[in-house]
Amino acid sequence: MLSNTIRSNFLKFYANRHHTILPSSPVFPHNDPSILFTNAGMNQFKDIFLNKEKVSYSRATTSQKCIRAGGKHNDLDNVGHTSRHLTFFEMLGNFSFGDYFKAEAIAFAWEVSLSVFNFNPEGIYATVHEKDDEAFALWEAYLPTDRIFRLTDKDNFWSMANTGPCGYCSELLFDRGPSFGNASSPLDDTDGERFLEYWNLVFMEFNRTSEGSLLALPNKHVDTGAGLERLVSLIAGTHTVFEADVLRELIAKTEQLSGKVYHPDDSGAAFRVIADHVRSLSFAIADGLLPGNTERGYVLRKILRRSVNYGRRLGFRNPFLAEIVPSLADAMGEAYPELKNSLSQIQKVLTLEEESFFKTLDRGGNLLQQVLKSSSSSSCISGEDAFKLKDTYGMPIDEISLLAKDYDYSVDMDTFHKLEQEAKERSRKNVVQSQGTSESIYNELHLTSEFIGYDHLSCDTFIEAIISKDHIVSSLQEKQEGAIVLKVSPFYAEKGGQVGDSGEIFCSEGTFIVTHTTSPKAGLIVHHGRISQGSLTVEAAVTAQVNRYRRKRIANNHTACHLLHKALEITLGDHIRQAGSYVDDTKIRLDFTHPQAISPEDLLCIETLVNESIRENEPVDIREALYSDVMNSSEIKQFFGDKYSDVVRVVSAGHSHELCGGTHAEATGDIGFFRITKEHAVAMGIRRIEAVTGEKAEATVHQQSEVLEEIATLLQVPRDQIVSRLTATLDERKQQDKRLNELENSLIQTKLDKLIHNCHQRQGITCLVHHLAEHENHRLQQYAQCLHQRIPEKLISLWTTEKNGKYIVLSRVSDDLITQGVHAQDLLKAVLTPCGGRWGGKDQSAQGSAPALPATEVLNETLWQWISTQLI
């Protein structure tokens, strides 16, 4: 693969120039709610640029997995219809953190363009900011001035946000020649097809204030990004990114599966959509995301449904995406081993989602017919209906428009676009970063805390800051609530699913009860609580003491959580991925990927494996290691989405080996005993196990034993005969229910004999209007079904009953009358509209309700009048 060669040579080039090669971060940022997906190489370095995080390296290079399919950067609707839009792409980049600046960045970029990308220097152009004389002068060493262009803020100024680090940027472009257009320079190339931008160099040299002023940064940074797929297309000389390398391989696989031939014109859009989307979906699932109904999961579901809709154009009527994934793993698995490691999980998730959506599409097709019918008076599909078809059933708006055109219908696009924009705003609102006053205060403190809590549960230290009611204060008085920052702290701050410590901070002047501990930013430990007696002031010498008994229970539960995770993997398979966890002093909660409920036998096996590890009482080994040494180890579990520092902690307990920053038991035997209390689904493809340990586990067993004893007493049998007695009792109940059903059916048939005798006939059609007593309302459907079985042709029935203070109405029409244009839902519309009622259903059967109804005789006359209008 050409992409593998370019990626490898790019990283090697910068590694040979003292850059640290770092792995790609996941496709979603773990601690940055301001963006849905990782959309640039600099995302993982954001805290470094903001001076919130210190690292051991000053130069770095990466190939970053990116997704642009939500929020501000959303290319989803363009994919398949343009030459280069993608939802998934790789961003090659080099970064300098206060090290080199413009001169070196430009020199490196020029050398890479010639020696790694092998571009003809005569085809390279550069743009700079109109005020960046320095960059212009630097480029003059490599390019003639007529190939360097000055542009405005719109094109050549980069900022992270409205305030903060920002700076000029310089873009590199390559002239692909006259076959890509007649533009004579990048300024004339309005669609950017001939002079294709392939690299952006960002020079962070300013700090924008809230007033809009640009102040020089004390440390200047470099952030560059070059799209790998675009580079491959340029080097291979293809017209689009889809005609070379990985994407062409995926298109070829889709050709094989569909039996159709790809063409690079508009007719090939379906192939391009599938090739791109299967990459986004596969990488997202491998990184721990799953399709869902909110936020990132909702975007993944939209991507998958868009893939399926385009797949249907190629003739796919059953799940097919999973069959393409092995080709992707073969092409990119060497660079991204998570694709191969998660292959079965990716395929399972895709297949389950596709199966679900194909069922939804069947309903959607019926809905479209109903929409067309309900819009018959205006010959226009409403914006609300169009949006529902797109948002709920995944039908692209262009497909809705085409289908509407087939029936000479139009679509209210103005309302549709308005609703779509409102939905985008709601989605964006869910993920927009909301910084509370307290968080802003913590950022202003410019403090860090030294954590010593792995080895010490108490220490003498100093108070560095106090916060109360969102203000920095100098002291806290008795009964006041607030937060304290210490210079040195033994308190573990909540993170990684483990709750923060509690305890006390005290001196002779006062005592502060710590209820919980957090870390609002890297390196800062904040102790929350209240003054129980006396007062405490900033700079006071104090003793910090963790509640050691609570800490021990938390540590035991955290180690048990690791053992549980390993037991799940052993019992259920290597597709298991942690999707979330919560550990405190009373319980364990572990969310994980698994497509179905766990059987009682497997739950018992999981519980047994954990307790076996506990009984072995092996020491829990915790060691520090360089992340670069362990990041590719298949034995050591790490969690995609977590951001790891240069040095990590490897926690080994029994057969479990995980990267973890939490606190743990000294030996597995400290856990005592493990008991699962609950297993259930929390989302599609996500299961949750809840468990307890130690004394809590023993108490749970005792409680369950007491319940069994009570049941045995009620059944008047020994405990070992409970199951057999209940089985016999339930069998007896089934027989009684069967006899009761037979009796009720006999009574229904007897009643139907009378009802049939009272049916009215006109024009060869049999009609019945009947009111059921309220005590029979649960048999409304049964009466209607039985009557239509007895009289299968030319029958219309209307049934009413009462329930919870309102009238329920059911209409049913025989199949032969449906073909003549008589429909059950239309009958209810005629009956219930004058009553202020509501209804819904299908042609054969429909049901509705109303606050009041006319007498049965009036309904009977209404029915015949309506029939006469239908059969004219």
UniProtKB/Swiss-Prot annotation:
Gene3D superfamilies in the cross-refs: 2.40.30.130, 3.10.310.40, 3.30.54.20, 6.10.250.550, Bira Bifunctional Protein, Domain 2, Threonyl-trna Synthetase, Chain A, domain 2
Sequence positions that bind Zn(2+): H558, H562, C660, H664
InterPro entries the UniProt entry points to: aa-tRNA-synth_II/BPL/LPL, Ala-tRNA-lgiase_IIc, Ala-tRNA-ligase_IIc_anticod-bd, Ala-tRNA-synth_IIc_core, Ala-tRNA-synth_IIc_N, Ala-tRNA_ligase, Ala_tRNA_ligase_euk/bac, DHHA1_dom
Top-level class of the enzyme under EC nomenclature: ligase
SMART domains: tRNA_SAD
Cofactor mode of binding and number, as noted: Binds 1 zinc ion per subunit.
EC annotation from Swiss-Prot or TrEMBL: 6.1.1.7
Predominant localisation class: cytoplasm
GO terms for biological process, alphabetical: alanyl-tRNA aminoacylation
Any Pfam family hit: DHHA1
Keyword presence, Cell inner membrane: no
Keyword terms, alphabetized: Aminoacyl-tRNA synthetase, ATP-binding, Cytoplasm, Ligase, Metal-binding, Nucleotide-binding, Protein biosynthesis, RNA-binding, tRNA-binding, Zinc
Residues that span the membrane, as ranges: none
A GO molecular-function annotation: alanine-tRNA ligase activity
One GO location term (cellular component): cytosol
Family: Belongs to the class-II aminoacyl-tRNA synthetase family.
Record text about domains: Consists of three domains; the N-terminal catalytic domain, the editing domain and the C-terminal C-Ala domain. The editing domain removes incorrectly charged amino acids, while the C-Ala domain, along with tRNA(Ala), serves as a bridge to cooperatively bring together the editing and aminoacylation centers thus stimulating deacylation of misacylated tRNAs.
Summary of the function given for this chain in its UniProt record: Catalyzes the attachment of alanine to tRNA(Ala) in a two-step reaction: alanine is first activated by ATP to form Ala-AMP and then transferred to the acceptor end of tRNA(Ala). Also edits incorrectly charged Ser-tRNA(Ala) and Gly-tRNA(Ala) via its editing domain.
Protein name: Alanine--tRNA ligase
Organism: Chlamydia pneumoniae (Chlamydophila pneumoniae)
